[in-house]
Curated annotation (Swiss-Prot):
It comes from the Bacteria. The chain crosses the membrane at residues 31-51, 58-78, 99-119, 126-146, 154-174, 180-200, 222-242, 243-263, 284-304. This is Protoheme IX farnesyltransferase. HAMAP family: CyoE_CtaB. Its EC number is 2.5.1.141. InterPro entries: Protohaem_IX_farnesylTrfase, UbiA_prenyltransferase, UbiA_prenylTrfase_CS, UbiA_sf. Its main location: membrane. It comes from Aromatoleum aromaticum (strain DSM 19018 / LMG 30748 / EbN1). The gene is ctaB.
């Protein structure tokens, strides 16, 4: 093989690797990780004793992850013109021209279709339909209808983001119980303070993109107060699993400790604001949800 052919082959491999990475980025893997984590926790909590069926867990995890990735790709496609105007998102594949809209749409369709097929045939139809509804809720209701029109986009659109544990629960039981809805309620209450912390230190970005996020429409002080109020609501909601005897003392201790930590962040964000601390609060909120759901799982298998 000539030196020229070797170099061409190497360049082709690099180009293929870059394209694969671009498709991977479309799925918003960090967000997807949290989605899948909460769904898997829902699967384990749904089984009163023992462990869920491993085949169901694997199939449901793959199906939910694929559809979540497809929803993220559709979000990137629909908001490509907005992403190009924002510092936080201008380096995504579509604004950079690494992928074309048509191939992004094809990728989302294949990924989502595969995920729904897996859920229908190897999990159960209820989980498939709930996952499809979640996809529509995020990619259409939130992205197209709510986000560009109302500062309450996060509050209303948070319903789709709160669905993962419900999907996991339905995957192993074939039904949606009151306990599953409690898990939904926790994420639903968590979503506004989580995203508004981000919106506070990225408010100039959102204003430049023309998106009516709360700091843009109502100002930073009102948004900081809203973060504090919703964090108080979240604290109360996280006590419900113990109050309903879904979880025990171990979870209660963890929920109270984590809740106090989140409240301290929210109070400081309100009383002594800085962009750096808003970023810190945003990051803490992600860790908070991971640890809270981990506490639910620990309490489930290690009851005191």
């Amino acid at each position: 093989m000539s030196v020229l052919n070797t170099r061409t082959l190497t360049l082709d491999r690099h180009a293929a690797a870059r394209r694969l990475h671009a498709f991977y980025v479309l799925t918003k893997p960090r967000v997807n990780t949290l989605i899948v984590f909460c769904a898997v926790i829902g699967m384990f909590l749904a089984v009163p004793d023992g462990l869920p069926d491993p085949k169901s867990v694997v199939a449901a995890t793959l199906g939910i992850a694929f559809v979540a990735g497809a929803a993220a790709a559709m979000n990137c496609l629909i908001e490509a013109h907005i992403d190009a105007r924002m510092a936080r998102t201008r380096h995504r594949p579509l604004p950079r021209g690494e992928l074309a809209p048509a191939e992004t749409l094809l990728f989302a369709g294949v990924l989502g279709g595969t995920g729904l097929t897996v859920l229908y045939h190897w999990v159960n139809p209820l989980t498939m339909w709930l996952t499809l509804a979640t996809f529509v809720g995020y990619a259409v209701v939130y992205t197209v209808l709510l986000k560009p029109r109302t500062p309450q986009n996060i509050v209303i659109g948070g319903a789709s983001g709160a669905m993962p544990p419900v999907l996991g629960w339905a995957a192993v039981t074939g039904e949606v119980s009151a306990d599953a809805l409690l898990l939904f309620l926790i994420i639903f209450a968590w979503t506004p303070p989580h995203f508004w912390a981000l919106a506070l230190y990225r408010s100039a970005d959102y204003a430049r993109a023309g998106l009516p996020m709360l700091p843009v429409t109502h100002g930073p002080e009102f948004t900081r107060l809203s973060v504090l109020l919703y964090t108080c609501i979240l604290f109360g909601v996280t006590l419900l699993p113990f109050a309903t005897r879904m979880s025990g003392p171990l979870y209660l201790v963890c929920a109270v400790a984590l809740g106090i930590g989140f409240l301290r962040h929210a109070w400081r964000l309100y009383a002594d604001y800085s962009d750096a601390f808003a970023r810190r609060t945003f990051r803490f909120s992600i860790l908070y949800l991971f640890l809270l759901f981990a506490a639910l799982l620990m309490d489930h298998y290690l009851p005191l």
